[in-house]
Swiss-Prot record:
Source species taxonomy: Eukaryota, Sar, Alveolata, Apicomplexa, Aconoidasida
Coiled-coil blocks: 41-118
Keywords assigned: Coiled coil, Merozoite
Applied use: Possible candidate for an effective malaria vaccine as determined by epitope response in sera.
Name of the featured protein: Uncharacterized protein
Organism superkingdom: Eukaryota
Source organism of this protein record: Plasmodium falciparum (isolate 3D7)
Amino acid sequence: MEELNKSGIYSKQFSLSQNKHNSERLQRLEKRLSGLHFSIELQKNEKIDKLNEKINSLEEKLIEMHENSNKTFEKLNEKLNDIRNDVTNYKNELEEFKNDHKKKLQLLEEKAEDFINKEKEDWSRLKIKLVKDFQHKAALLKEEMVEEYGLIEEKEDSLRKYYDCEINNIKSIIQNEISERIKTEKIILSDVDDKINEIMKIIRNEKTTRETYSENLVSLIEQYFSRIKKEIDMERLEREDTEETLVHLMEEALDKIGIPLA
């Protein structure tokens, strides 16, 4: 019986010792697990901080790219406005040039018409004067015929000769005057035609110059737009690459910290 009691006491002591040992092991294990958990949390926080730094850096780059893109579009709008102003000025100058030459041509036509009308009036006055002179001389001859009635035959012959001579002289004068007037009118018309042709040549040359300038301007605009489009496409590709890189880094970071993708 005593042996059984002793055996029970020893068994209890061994059990208490074993429990104490296990408790100490559990405490040490808890400390190690606590240290491991702290180390894991520390590494996790460091990785998250680094990831946040990378994300902030990428966000800054995206903001900078966005600002550069806005500046590029602002410059493009400014250049487009300059081009619009140049085209408007060109149209205004061309319209002013046309109006100026039109006014000059109208003025030249008015002067030519006034000159021709003046010449016609002078010619009409000259014809009236010649007729009056002829009538006056005829009246004088008639008076002389009446006064010298006794010498009518002689007077008639003299009158006929004089009449023929005067008529021939008057015809000659009139023909010469007509020839001079026609010659003068031809010279005037030729001069007017030359000036009109010269003005039309200037207008055609100016039109050709303007058309060449317009074609060169359109070519420069097309080249500029092509270059701007290439720059915009390059910026878009760089932005897409940056976004892809950001997504890839975020996926890697989530994989490292053990967070599953949604």
